[in-house]
UniProtKB/Swiss-Prot annotation:
Any matching Pfam family: zf-C3HC4_3
Zn-finger region bounds: RING-type: 1258-1296
Assembly and oligomerization: Component of the KPC complex composed of RNF123/KPC1 and UBAC1/KPC2. Interacts with UBAC1 and CDKN1B via its N-terminal domain. Interacts with RIGI (via N-terminus) and IFIH1 (via N-terminus).
Protein name (Swiss-Prot/TrEMBL): E3 ubiquitin-protein ligase RNF123
GO BP terms: protein maturation; protein polyubiquitination; proteolysis involved in protein catabolic process; ubiquitin-dependent protein catabolic process
Residues found modified as Asymmetric dimethylarginine: R687
């Protein structure tokens, strides 16, 4: 059934006013008596019914208008002006003209408000002083707000709002309190989607509130009344909180008997509309039978419009009066909405859709376009309000009815296209229809009956016990778990009904076959969807215009379901296309300008920069030529954007914005209205699309200059099906295909753009929301641990201590009730957010991103055009699957899981150091993702499975010098590859931290050691092969170790001085954190040195290499410095460790000493004797070497100096022997052999050492004799100092002259040469 009727064209004009001749001719179609009976049956008076046939005059279309006018006469006793007890305009709105302090954003209709300051206050334009009154507040966010009443004399500010002054009264559902100068507990907690009714009884002087129609009881009594006392509805909101008021402009959702809305309903129009609706319903249920000459009663669901002139003329007379009424908000919601909902509730979905479809046909047929458009707009806004602010009931019946009606309306093609073009994304947020809100009060939602038995997982609270405490499940626990799971399944099935309806609605919006009268729905949706994404991508700092993330999560899942349906449907009819499992975004979409990415960052930087630097590659690889003149104009346009003249900027602003809203700050100032309450902010168009002329060469062959045809990319708002899907000469979105891309089509181009937008949605806010919802599960685990600890205490508590038993029993009850509540909420969260189906959606997006990145990488330099969010979504979606969905569902069961892990590993390994990626944030994200990846055994094995050349390239990038780049994460990756192989390096947590409260065991740093011998071997091979790889890498590691440990020592000196002051003082927590970080960096750098010297000892010990001796001397110097600082008893390090300051938990003797010991053992207790002797001589030659530091490792006290006091006998000494669980007996034996070797070698060195003249010592280190002279300046030092200096700087240490060469210098030879010359 189309809006044209049964192949006949009817218009409202044809049937509203007709000539007498026409009426006579039409009347003759049926008998006069039958027509009169029919019209009396349709237009019967509600008061007197249908008059008897003998007492009435015949009714026909000639005298019908008079009859209808008489039928619609209403005695309007209700005054539309002033009513006793009320002062102010009859149309009640928020007073945005001033009289209060605070900053607020007020919607166009002056009924919605968003807090935009610390605590802004606003009141209504009308007050009451007598009688019983009520208004409703629709809660859009559940934060800090105080809602109630105030008088005109109340003065508010940014700290004090409604309820904080005399004669102002408020209810605060966020803190569950009532306010009137003082505060007490009152009511229940509210949530987003609730409706608060505010009632004031000025006859009795009482004030009360209702939440979703349920009374919360009397809040205040003995209100001040009398002369000058009138009360205004008022609200105070904190920043970002939002509500909408209903003073009576729409039917109250929860009317209260005896209480009157502040704004009177349109009584006369309401009666007329109800009578006209009754006439319309009668038309649907009564049929003319001309053959039998009688009226036939039938079900309205069976009614069909057959083009009967009598029926059409009758409907024309009805709509002549009905159409103007259907433009009014109140009447649409009270009359039309109720009628349509009744149809949906009574019939089957198919019957309801058929009837609604025909009703919409009639609306378009008999009403003017502007009338039906206003009607549909109000209808959808009412539907959205009803859906959004409906309470959750056990069977979700309310939500199902509203969604079924929404779907029935959208099935009507003409209505759907109008709503898509003008309403769904412009006037209201259609994403609300795809949201299923989470109930805050599980009892009211019926979850207690749906899930009568609760259960929660029992997890061990101590890490390191490896599940030793994990008891087997008892029979009772197993029965509880199964009963809980059955309840969860019942809940999930009910939620799936709602989700399926939401998917069906989206399928209607994505229909691309309804192009009979204009553009198909999908292409309208694409334009609006892109603007929606632009608003949320560009409005990060403007919270009011952003779509709430919880809505985005639901919208994304429904969009993925609808998208995959259409994708696979296209594959079924086009065998050459791809299945949705193989979906990806072709790389040309990122650089051909056909899709708007707003101002989002690209991997290679700014789009304007990429277009200039890569224009040759675009021409050679993608056949896209950018006009230099247009490019220059676009660049200058971007530069001058902020310097445009004021009038032009103002005109542009007005052209881009919807109607303004009021800025409530003592006066009415224009401000862009917040998108969530009204229309979106469009923002500026992409400069690439609007100004850059792009030349496109469509054939895949080399073209001459003459064949290059210049065309301009179409703006997003102007695109048609041909612009997107293409034609025989135009590839549409896929214009500029690179040679690496296959020619076969993936799917319809429009679906590619929907997929691209879906990936962008995930990056905008979905991932953060998925992480936020994990908090419910965390709360369950915390309360479960608290309950178990309480039950353990109850079992241990002596029965004679009844006071303790009573307190423990009370705590047990509190924890049990809280767990019952949380476990039911968790069931809801798992069903709506973390279900298996939702996990598959996120996994599919991960695979889409991986394939998109792989295809983009093949384009070479054009990969830089890819938006950054593709890489971030690949990283974040994997993190979500592992950390958010993993505890509920097993990742190993995902299809192709191992292959996906390997592909992601290859991407991280290749691109973390990719020069085509310039953004600091995305490079850091890639580095952190790779660092996390190598911490878990299954993902580390995936790294080992990538091709060998990629593994070697990754390790080569890890071994690049640390200077001029972020190196901490790189070093941490190398440490993780070594952890489990180093000396005493098999711990998960440090030994001294095991007894403290555990952290999250899922953290990467708390995973069990899983070293990679394969990657270690690659590292060893690279360090051996490259002549300059090892020196530059180790020089940078030694430099960073010197810096990190020096910073650490400097900071603990400041901390120690602050701790020793007598006056009260505080140490900055940030300083403690930086101090601990420097210590951790020092330990990790030492571990990298240990790994290097273990894998490739010849780098330090093969002195045939030019840098080996220098590196060994530097290493020995640093090791001795660390040992001296850490091992001296009662020194700075010892005292700070003893303080055990919060934030310095990781600072301890063990981690840094075992790292140093591992290096020393490898140098002195392994390898041939020649290498050992070389290492020993270098170590002993360092002036900072002290044998007591080595003895300290085994707990041996240093010899007492003459006259020194004996150490305290109860002092606990550090010793590696005390860590038998962490250090093996073989390792301890190696330390003992090392100590014996050094003891003997130091004794020999002491006997052989000769005194040295101070003038002959190196002026840089004052430790070694001068042995080198710099040319041409002639300054001198020891070889070790100048070699180390030249690793980083070529200027002279003393005079800054450039050093050309370094020559050996011998004092005796120099002296003799001088004497000879003399």
């Amino acid at each position: 059934m189309t809006s044209k009727g049964a192949a006949m064209s009817f218009s409202r004009k044809s049937y509203r006013l007709t000539s007498d001749a026409e009426k006579s001719r039409v009347t003759g179609i049926v008998q006069e008596k039958l027509l009169s009976d029919y019209l009396y049956r349709i237009f019967s008076s509600p008061d007197h019914g249908t008059p008897a046939a003998t007492s009435r005059k015949p009714l026909n279309f000639h005298n019908l208008p008079e009859h209808v006018d008489q039928l619609l006469q209403v005695d309007d006793e209700e005054s539309q002006g002033q009513v006793e007890g009320r002062l102010g305009p009859s149309t009640v709105v928020l007073d945005h003209t001033g009289g209060f302090e605070g900053l607020l954003l007020v919607d166009d209709d002056l009924l919605g408000v968003i807090g935009h300051s610390n605590f802004g206050t606003i009141r209504s334009s009308t007050c009451v002083y007598k009688g019983k009154w009520v208004y409703e507040v629709l809660i859009s966010s559940q934060g800090l707000m105080q809602i109630g009443w105030c008088t005109i004399n109340c003065r508010f500010n940014q700290e004090e709002g409604v309820g904080d002054t005399h004669n102002s009264y408020a209810y605060d559902g966020n803190r569950v309190r009532k306010w009137n100068v003082t505060t007490t507990n009152y009511g229940k907690a509210w949530a987003a989607g609730d409706i608060v009714s505010c009632l004031i009884d000025l006859d009795d002087g009482t004030l009360s509130f209702c939440l979703n129609g349920v009374s919360l009881g009397t809040a205040f009594e003995n209100l001040s009344r009398g002369l000058g006392m009138a009360y205004f509805p008022a609200i105070s909101l904190s920043f970002k909180e939002s509500v909408a008021f209903n003073f009576g402009s729409r039917p109250l959702r929860y009317p209260v008997a005896g209480f009157r809305p502040l704004q009177d309903p349109p009584f006369a129009d309401l009666v007329r509309a109800q009578r006209l609706l009754g006439c319309f319903q009668t038309v649907l249920s009564v049929e003319l039978d001309p053959v039998e000459g009688r009226l036939v009663e039938k079900e309205s669901s069976e009614w069909q419009l057959h083009g009967q002139p009598t029926v059409l003329l009758t409907l024309a007379h009805i709509f002549h009066h009905f159409a103007p009424l259907l433009r009014k908000v109140y009447l649409v919601e009270a009359v039309l909405m109720s009628f349509l909902l009744g149809i949906v509730e009574k019939g089957t979905p198919e019957q309801a859709q058929s009837v609604v479809h025909q009703i919409l046909d009639l609306l378009w047929l008999f009403m003017e376009d502007y009338e039906v458009q206003d009607c549909l707009k109000q209808l959808m806004m009412s539907l959205l309000r009803l859906y959004r602010f409906s309470p959750i009931v056990p069977d979700l019946g309310l939500q199902i009815h509203y969604l079924r009606l929404t779907m029935a309306v959208l099935r009507h093609e003409k209505s759907r296209k109008f709503l898509l073009s003008n309403v769904l994304f412009d006037m209201l947020r259609s994403v609300v229809f795809f949201y299923i809100k989470s109930p805050l009060r599980v009892e009211e939602a019926g979850l207690k009956e749906l899930i009568p038995t609760t259960w929660w997982p029992h997890r061990s609270s101590r890490e390191g016990r490896d599940g030793q405490e994990a008891k087997e499940e008892t029979t009772e626990e197993r029965q509880r778990r199964r009963a809980y799971e059955r309840g969860c399944q019942r809940l999930k099935k009910r939620i799936e009904v709602v989700e399926e309806l939401q998917v069906q609605i989206l399928k209607l919006l994505l229909d691309n076959k309804d192009d009979n009268g204009g553009e198909a729905s999908r292409y309208i949706f694409l334009t609006k969807f892109r603007k929606f994404l632009q608003e949320n991508a560009s409005g990060r700092g403007n919270t009011p215009v952003l779509c709430p993330p919880e809505y985005m999560v639901c919208f994304l899942h429904r969009l993925v379901s609808a998208l995959r349906f259409y994708w696979d449907e296209y594959k079924a009819s086009n065998p050459r296309a791809s299945f949705s499992d193989e979906a990806y975004i072709p790389p040309q979409i990122f650089y051909n300008g056909k899709v708007d990415y707003f101002d989002l960052q690209r991997l290679g930087g700014l789009l304007s920069h990429l277009r200039k630097t890569l224009k040759d590659d675009l021409a050679s690889k993608a056949n896209i030529v950018i006009d230099p003149l247009e490019l220059q104009a676009a660049t200058m346009d971007d530069l001058d954007e902020d310097e445009e003249p004021a009038p032009t900027a103002a005109q542009s602003w007005r052209a881009r914005q919807r109607p303004v809203q009021a800025l409530a700050i003592g006066g009415a100032l224009p401000l862009p209205r917040p998108g969530w309450l009204s229309s979106p902010t469009l923002g500026r168009a992409n400069r690439f699309l609007s100004t850059a002329a792009v030349s496109l060469m469509t054939p895949r062959r080399l073209l001459s200059t003459m064949e290059k045809v210049k065309v301009r990319s179409l703006n997003v708002e102007q695109r048609t099906r041909e612009d997107i899907e293409g034609s025989h000469w135009n590839e549409g979105l896929l214009l500029g295909r690179p040679p690496e891309e296959p020619e076969r089509p993936l799917t319809e181009n429009s679906l590619l753009e929907v997929l691209d937008g879906t990936v962008m949605m995930y990056s905008l806010s979905v991932h953060q929301q998925l992480g936020k919802m994990v908090g419910v599960s965390d709360d369950v685990n915390e309360y479960a641990m608290a309950l178990r600890d309480t039950e353990d205490k109850l079992r241990r508590c002596p029965k004679r201590r009844k006071d303790i038993l009573a307190e423990l029993t009370k705590s047990q009850k509190v924890f049990s009730e809280k767990l019952d509540h949380l476990s039911r909420r968790l069931a809801w969260v798992h069903a709506t957010v973390y279900s298996q189906e939702k996990m598959l959606d996120i996994y599919w997006l991960l695979r889409v991103c991986l394939q998109t990145i792989e295809h983009g990488d093949r384009t070479g330099s054009l990969f830089a055009f890819m938006p950054e969010f593709y890489l971030s979504v690949a990283i974040n979606s994997y993190s979500a699957l592992k950390n958010y969905f993993g505890p509920v569902h097993s990742m190993e069961e995902l299809p192709g899981y191992e292959e996906t892990l390997t592909r992601l590993a290859a991407i991280l390994a290749k691109h973390f150091a990719d020069p085509r990626i310039v953004g600091t944030d995305i490079r850091d994200s890639l580095m952190q993702a790779l660092a996390s990846y190598v911490c878990y055994p299954h993902s580390l094995r995936a790294v080992e499975r990538i091709p060998e050349e990629q593994r070697i390239a990754m390790v080569r990038n890890l071994l690049a010098p640390y200077e001029q780049r972020p190196w901490a994460q790189t070093n941490w990756i190398l440490v993780r590859l070594w952890r489990g192989c180093g000396f005493g390096y098999r711990y998960t947590r440090l030994p001294h931290l095991l007894k403290t409260k555990p952290e999250d065991a899922n953290l990467p740093s708390l995973q069990k050691p899983c070293p990679s011998t394969l990657l270690q071997q690659h590292m060893a091979d690279l360090l051996r092969q490259g002549s300059d790889v090892a020196p530059s890498f180790l020089n940078s590691v030694l430099n960073q170790l010197n810096w990190a440990f020096s910073e650490f020592i400097g900071m603990i000196q400041e901390i120690q001085q602050a701790a020793e002051r007598l006056e009260r003082n505080f140490v900055d927590s940030r300083q403690l954190k930086v101090c601990a970080t420097c210590f951790d960096l020092s330990v990790s750098l030492l571990r990298v040195l240990e790994m290097t010297i273990t894998l490739v000892p010849e780098i330090f010990l093969d002195w045939s290499r030019p840098t080996s001796e220098m590196l060994l001397r530097r290493l020995a110097q640093l090791l001795n410095q660390v040992l001296n600082r850490v091992t001296a008893e009662r020194n700075l390090f010892d005292r700070v460790v003893t303080l055990r300051l919060p934030g310095l938990e990781s600072v301890d003797h063990y981690p840094i000493l075992v790292a140093v010991t591992g290096i020393l053992v490898r140098l002195l207790a392994h390898g041939p004797s020649s290498e050992t002797e070389q290492a020993t001589s270098v170590l002993l030659a360092d002036p900072c070497f002290q044998l007591r530091s080595i003895r300290y490792l085994l707990g041996q006290p240093e010899p007492l100096a003459p006259g020194s006091a004996l150490p305290a006998p109860d002092r606990k000494r550090f010793s590696l022997q005390s860590y038998a669980d962490y250090i093996s007996a073989e390792e301890l034996a190696q330390v003992e052999r090392m100590l014996a070797h050094l003891t003997a070698a130091s004794a020999q060195a002491a006997a052989a050492s000769l005194p040295t003249n101070e003038e002959d010592l190196c002026p840089i280190c004052y430790a070694h004799p001068i042995s080198a002279v710099f040319q041409p300046c002639g300054h001198k030092s020891c070889k070790a100092c100048i070699n180390q200096h030249l690793m980083n700087n070529k200027d002279c240490f003393f005079c800054k002259a450039t050093i050309v060469s370094v020559e050996d210098w011998d004092k005796a030879a120099s002296t003799s040469a001088t004497s000879s010359a003399a």
